[in-house]
Amino acid sequence: MTTTYAIVDIETTGTDPKVDRMIQFGCVLVENQKIVGRFSTDINPSQMISRQIQSLTQISNRQVQKAPYFEDIAQTIYNLLQDTVFVAHNIHFDYHFLNHELVRCGMPRLTIAGIDTVELAQIFLPTESSYRLNDLAESLGIIHENPHQAASDAEV
């Protein structure tokens, strides 16, 4: 049986899933070292995005104004991730935040296996001075055109 890896990144209005909301979801599906699918979407957080987050992510309130609410795409995201291995850079944030959003919408938590690319980088690249995604991409010669955009971060 082929393993499908779901490389995920989310952007949020802040770091506390109790009060903050997702504003972007990006996922790249990989099987046998080949990209087999992609899914990304802006998400209307039903709250204002702070200037700090807008500056960091380049995601504006206007951009997400007509985007779907998380509850409208929760089932799609849940189905996409079922039977995959969840891969993220700092998985503890993305996996926890996403699960919190799913439960908030009345969905079950994800219970899939996960891999943290920060931990992998620390093991395989122990001499790096920074494990931020942007810094690692630069160090490895990977072009990262849109940092802090979920689809771009997942692709990198």
Q: What kind of region is each of these model predictions?
A:
Residues 1-112, 126-148:
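Conserved non-catalytic scaffold segment of RNase H-like nuclease domains
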Residues 73, 121, 156:
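Short Asp/Glu-rich motifs
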Residues 111-121:
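A short, structured active-site edge motif that brings together acidic residues
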Residues 119, 131-135, 155:
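Residues on a specific face of well-ordered alpha-helices
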Residues 149-156:
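Acidic, divalent-metal-coordinating active-site segment for phosphoryl/phosphodiester hydrolysis
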